[in-house]
């Protein structure tokens, strides 16, 4: 049997959050207050925004795409992979026979860059379930174009791949 500790989270009332310590001092946070899931929390999939000639990787595109194939292989071996790319047919040729295609979904969408952490949906959990927030990335203070990347989440939700 684990221990329960009340813990206010982000100004939440003590009753809104419980921390359970297990036998080996592992812990699990149970909360009804809005929060971002931990990086180790269960997830429905991972998004990769695929490199192409219009991204910063042009000078070493072949090498970077090979790296993305290796990343895609590892992800799709374990869970759903969403690949965002303006060229899904080309990406399919690159990964066919090298990646578990049963776990791969594609979203055809123009992109500026590959950094999904900058433009991907933000998941918010609360008592009502899961919400996806459509974060607007400003390209590091307008240093880089991000207009196409800022459309990815909306298009993924509209096409029901997310």
Which sequence ranges carry the predicted segments?
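Universal eukaryotic N-terminal targeting presequences
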Residues: 1-2, 25
């Amino acid at each position: 049997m684990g221990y329960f500790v009340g813990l206010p989270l982000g100004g939440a009332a003590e009753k809104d959050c419980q921390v359970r310590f297990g036998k080996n001092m592992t812990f699990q946070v149970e909360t009804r207050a809005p929060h971002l899931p931990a990086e180790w929390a269960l997830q429905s999939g991972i998004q990769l925004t695929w490199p192409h000639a219009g991204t910063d990787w042009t000078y070493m595109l072949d090498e970077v795409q090979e790296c993305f194939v290796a990343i895609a292989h590892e992800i799709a071996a374990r869970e759903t992979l969403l690949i965002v790319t303006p060229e899904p047919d080309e990406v399919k040729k690159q990964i066919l026979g090298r990646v578990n295609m049963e776990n791969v979904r594609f979203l055809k969408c123009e992109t500026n860059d590959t950094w999904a952490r900058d433009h991907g949906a933000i998941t918010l959990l609360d008592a009502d379930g899961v919400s996806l927030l459509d974060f607007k990335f400003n390209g590091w203070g307008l240093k880089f174009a991000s207009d196409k990347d800022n459309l990815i989440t909306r298009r993924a939700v509209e096409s029901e791949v997310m």
